[in-house]
């Protein structure tokens, strides 16, 4: 039999959960009704799609397809910050770091807040105000994330940036479907436009979460985008495997060795993966070597379309 004190604590916990749910529903409600939307499973183009593109179109795509990268950092992330700066962000058409405070070691844009949601919304507003006429797609990541930007561009190849895309690794929390920031978040310029129009409307996109329960920044973003008619969509390859990953390659391989010991490499993850998360600085450099430097003699990949790294990139 539970003691009176434990019964009291149980009641407090249940009451808190109830209040949290009410707060969450209040955020997601649009007008006087709820919008019901099952997220789509968007796939990368196949080789046949690419083969149908003319040589002139391929050249134009390789030059005009532009991705702006946003990395949210804090001073405690300085070693990860250095690794990200020296590795995959060099393949973004432009990458900028948004920090919680001024950091002398690396150049960054000071958001002057430790709150991750405030940092995220300020970074999105800055990116839209500064670069809305220069970039088609906006990719946001943590400093623990490694991204293969060429694979991101390939995945987005047949997607229309004038449509409201909100892509990545989707997660469902109650009635809310959102893209996990751990795997990286991709917004089209149209989604950025819609989000920007709501950032100054606190009733639909508040700077803070509920008074009782604060939700994570990626969930808060989904709430704001839902008001704008933009919904989370899961990104997959032609085999249905996720291309935005919230875990590291090492963890995927460990799981595959347990669950699919005869198909560790094939069962691990997509060979067109865009992101992995939870990496150390050392693992960032290992990934960079494996993705861009290591070659198996005799194995040649004749890709029909090549996305060239931006001018000034030291990586090939």
UniProtKB/Swiss-Prot annotation:
InterPro entries with a match to the protein in the record: C1GALT1/C1GALT1_chp1
Positions in the Lumenal compartment: 27-316
Membrane topology summary: Single-pass type II membrane protein
Species this chain originates from: Mus musculus
Primary localisation category: membrane
Signal peptide stretch: none
Name of this protein: C1GALT1-specific chaperone 1
Source taxon at top rank: Eukaryota
Record keyword Chaperone present: yes
Subcellular location: Membrane
Keywords linked to the UniProt accession: Chaperone, Membrane, Signal-anchor, Transmembrane, Transmembrane helix
Function of the protein: Probable chaperone required for the generation of 1 O-glycan Gal-beta1-3GalNAc-alpha1-Ser/Thr (T antigen), which is a precursor for many extended O-glycans in glycoproteins. Probably acts as a specific molecular chaperone assisting the folding/stability of core 1 beta-3-galactosyltransferase (C1GALT1).
Cysteine-cysteine disulfides: none
Xref: PANTHER family: BETA1,3-GALACTOSYLTRANSFERASE (PTHR23033), C1GALT1-SPECIFIC CHAPERONE 1 (PTHR23033:SF2)
Any GO BP: protein O-linked glycosylation
Record text on subunit structure and interactions: Associates with core 1 beta-3-galactosyltransferase (C1GALT1), probably not with the soluble active form.
Family per record: Belongs to the glycosyltransferase 31 family. Beta3-Gal-T subfamily.
GO cellular component: a single term: membrane
Residue stretches spanning the membrane: 7-26
């Amino acid at each position: 039999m539970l003691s009176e004190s434990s019964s009291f604590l149980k009641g407090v916990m249940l009451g808190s959960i109830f209040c949290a749910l009410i707060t969450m529903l209040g955020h997601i409600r649009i007008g006087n009704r709820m919008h019901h939307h099952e997220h789509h499973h968007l796939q990368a183009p196949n080789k046949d799609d690419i083969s149908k593109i003319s040589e002139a179109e391929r050249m134009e795509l390789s030059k005009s397809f532009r991705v702006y990268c946003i990395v949210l950092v804090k001073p405690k992330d300085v070693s990860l910050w250095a690794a990200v700066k020296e590795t995959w962000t060099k393949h973004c058409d432009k990458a900028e770091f948004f920090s919680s405070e001024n950091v002398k070691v690396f150049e960054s844009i000071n958001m002057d807040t430790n709150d991750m949601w405030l940092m995220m919304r300020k970074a999105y507003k800055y990116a839209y105000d500064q670069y809305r006429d220069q970039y088609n797609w906006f990719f946001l990541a943590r400093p623990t994330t490694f991204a293969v930007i060429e694979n991101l561009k390939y995945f987005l190849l047949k997607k229309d940036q004038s449509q409201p895309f909100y892509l990545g690794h989707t997660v469902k929390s109650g009635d809310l479907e959102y893209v996990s920031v751990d795997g990286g978040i991709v917004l089209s310029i149209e989604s950025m436009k819609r989000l920007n129009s709501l950032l100054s409307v606190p009733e639909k996109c508040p700077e803070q979460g509920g008074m009782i329960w604060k939700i994570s920044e990626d969930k808060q973003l989904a709430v704001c985008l839902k008001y704008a008619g933009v919904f989370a969509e899961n990104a997959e390859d032609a085999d249905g495997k996720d291309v935005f990953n919230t875990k590291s390659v090492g963890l995927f391989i460990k799981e595959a060795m347990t669950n699919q010991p005869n198909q560790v490499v094939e069962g691990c993850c997509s060979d067109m993966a865009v992101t992995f998360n939870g990496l150390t600085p050392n693992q960032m450099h290992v990934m960079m070597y494996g993705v861009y430097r290591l070659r198996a003699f005799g194995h040649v990949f004749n890709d029909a379309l090549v996305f060239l790294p931006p001018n000034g990139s030291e990586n090939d």
